[in-house]
Design a protein with these regions (language model features):
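Short beta-rich binding modules
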Residues: 1-8, 12-113
């Protein structure tokens, strides 16, 4: 996980594209930038601080400026590398559960269509 954070830190400030699997559909996120990447104490969550990203829904774009974006790695590929299959959007001091945040994002995208 620390190797992943180190790699992501080399991308800080550059445009990167991430894909997350939300509730019922895939949410595509294009990041304008993020400040840095760190790993949680339990080494299960990678956090991108100062992330800026855009959610794409058909022809509509919803810009979001959270304080951080948490990436939960919950499975591994054949080489043992972590594969991110859930990106959790956590603005500031929001205590909403990751499932609720992804559900809200899916609803927002559906309504935008």
């Amino acid at each position: 996980m620390h190797k992943v954070a180190k790699i992501l830190n080399t991308l800080a400030g550059h445009r990167v594209v991430l894909v997350s699997h939300g509730v019922g559909e895939t949410l595509s996120c294009r990041h304008g930038h993020f400040q840095d990447a760190t790993v949680s104490e339990d080494e299960e969550v990678l956090v991108l601080h100062g992330a800026y990203y855009t959610l794409f829904a058909a022809r509509h774009e919803v810009e979001i400026h959270p304080d951080e974006l948490s990436i939960v790695f919950s499975r591994f590929n054949a080489f043992g590398d972590p594969i991110a299959n859930a990106f959790v959007f956590c603005p500031g001091e929001d205590q909403t559960s990751p499932r609720d945040i992804l559900r809200e994002a899916s609803v927002a995208l559906a309504e935008a269509r």
